[in-house]
């Protein structure tokens, strides 16, 4: 679907990092932003995982903020909803989590840590064309992509799933991929 993006540590701050030639250090996060194609249709899924198998306390805190934002967006997905509403939901959920961590006091500053939109179309292209000003319709497929980037902590991460709009909500097509701190740490401990 596209060249895989694999980045460790602060290289995650380069959203489409294309030079995976650096050594990854103990304690760093590794971003895996990958896709697959079938009959010319593509996917786009991202996860981060700790190089040493365990999230640090700060990494886990930020990961949970992004996870909660990702899930808040999924709860809003249904026919008739507009993409800008989902982007707003992601920013609002991220703000609440970042505020609780003492990183933000004013919603106007959210772009300091949330650098990209929360949704984009997938299909014939990774960032497929589609009307962002048109409401969602049943059987549309797009990403839910919550990302948080805190340079002063040296932590950047995103959780990106592919979802299918259903009559009453959405189906997470990438639900089988571990996505919570606990699921990822468990997987890392067994491999």
Placement of each model-derived feature along the sequence:
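Active-site neighborhoods and metal-handling regions in enzymes and metal-associated proteins
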Residues: 1-191
């Amino acid at each position: 679907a596209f060249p895989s993006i694999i980045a460790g540590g602060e290289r995650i701050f380069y959203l489409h990092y294309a030079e995976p030639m650096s050594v990854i250090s103990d304690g760093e996060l590794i971003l895996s932003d990958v896709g697959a194609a079938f009959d010319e249709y593509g996917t786009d899924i991202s996860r981060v995982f700790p190089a040493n198998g365990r999230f640090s306390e700060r990494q886990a805190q930020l990961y949970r903020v992004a996870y909660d934002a990702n899930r808040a967006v999924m709860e809003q997905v249904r026919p008739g909803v507009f993409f800008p509403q989902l982007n707003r939901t992601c920013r609002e959920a991220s703000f609440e989590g970042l505020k609780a961590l003492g990183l933000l006091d004013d919603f106007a500053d959210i772009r300091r840590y949330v650098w990209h939109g929360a949704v984009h179309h997938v299909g014939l292209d990774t960032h497929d064309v589609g009307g962002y000003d048109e409401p969602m319709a049943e059987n549309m497929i797009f990403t839910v992509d919550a990302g948080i980037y805190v340079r002063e902590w040296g932590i950047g991460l995103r959780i990106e799933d592919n979802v299918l709009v259903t009559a009453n909500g959405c189906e997470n097509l990438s639900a089988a991929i571990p996505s919570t701190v606990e699921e990822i740490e468990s997987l890392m401990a067994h491999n």
